[in-house]
Design a protein with these regions (language model features):
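Non-transmembrane, membrane-proximal soluble domains of secreted or membrane proteins
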Residues: 1, 23-267
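Membrane-embedded alpha-helical segments of integral membrane proteins
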Residues: 1-28
């Protein structure tokens, strides 16, 4: 990104200077006639070839960057998690001990059976899947996200991880990354401590006015990583928020033991 910005800034500075310089130099004046200049093959070749080379370089560099982001190396043993979007909430589905997600289809949703994501009950890989309303990640372990949407176009947006991918009805989209800072570590950084203090100071001031009106005070703000929807998906779009907890392997294992596997969650 820095390389692209530097190149764009240099080219923009030069071209904007020339644009304004020549507009001034060759401004209309009384008694001056315009010169008709039909063409110049050399100039046309220069201003065609140079942009082609620069743009091709940026595109090729971008493709390598995109590939490094989108290609998940299976040798790194990434944790496979499905992010399931629907109006107006998120669900996370963990792939269980086998690290393989079971087959699923919205046509298989059966609320009476508590099969809320439409998992194939006959698929052996689905039996140990775990469905949650919080997203817990292990620090330092790669994650392979697969995304589905039940209804309309949503967008899985994790601003703190600079990651975003559309959730498209009828197809599975995916990306991966490795979280490197736990939630507790992020909360302890000087920048975050200062930000939280500033936010809570404002909340205290606002709460005084609310309490004076007989209303409840605002809750104290605590930092959490968040999964948001970045597509306006309906009137309750704002409610599409899921807490993300980045923690140690031991903390994750303890949390996972408290969750029900799919086979044990059906009615």
């Amino acid at each position: 990104m820095i390389i692209s910005m530097v190149i764009i800034f240099i080219v923009q500075t030069i071209t904007q200077f020339l644009l304004h310089y020549f507009a001034f130099k060759y401004r209309g004046e009384k008694g001056k006639k315009a010169l008709f200049y039909a063409d110049n093959n050399t100039l046309e070749a220069i201003w065609t070839i140079i942009p082609v080379i620069v743009l091709a370089g940026l595109i090729i560099y971008g493709l390598f960057t995109w590939t490094s982001i989108m290609n998940i190396n299976e040798d790194d043993d990434p944790m496979v998690i499905e992010l399931y979007a629907q109006q107006f909430n998120w669900k996370a589905r963990y792939s269980g001990q086998d690290n393989v997600l079971g087959m699923a289809n919205v046509r298989l949703i059966d609320l009476d059976r508590a099969n809320i994501l439409g998992l194939d009950e006959a698929d052996p890989n689905a039996q140990d899947d775990v469905i949650t309303t919080e997203l817990h990640l292990v620090v330092g372990r790669p994650v392979h996200f697969k995304m589905r949407s039940q209804d309309v176009l949503h967008s899985a947006y994790m601003p703190h991880f600079r990651a975003q991918m559309n959730c498209v009805p009828g197809m599975v989209t995916e990306f991966g990354f490795t979280p490197t800072v736990t939630t507790e570590q992020m909360r302890a950084t000087p920048e975050m401590v200062e930000k939280v203090q500033r936010i809570n100071k404002i909340r205290v001031e606002k709460s005084e006015a609310l309490v004076a009106k007989g209303e409840s005070a605002l809750d104290t703000y605590t930092f959490d990583y968040l999964l948001l929807c970045n597509k306006i998906c309906g009137k309750s779009h704002y409610n599409m928020q899921m807490k993300i907890i980045v923690e140690t392997q031991e903390e994750f294992d303890a949390w996972m033991k408290e969750q029900k596997e799919f086979k044990n969650s059906l009615n």
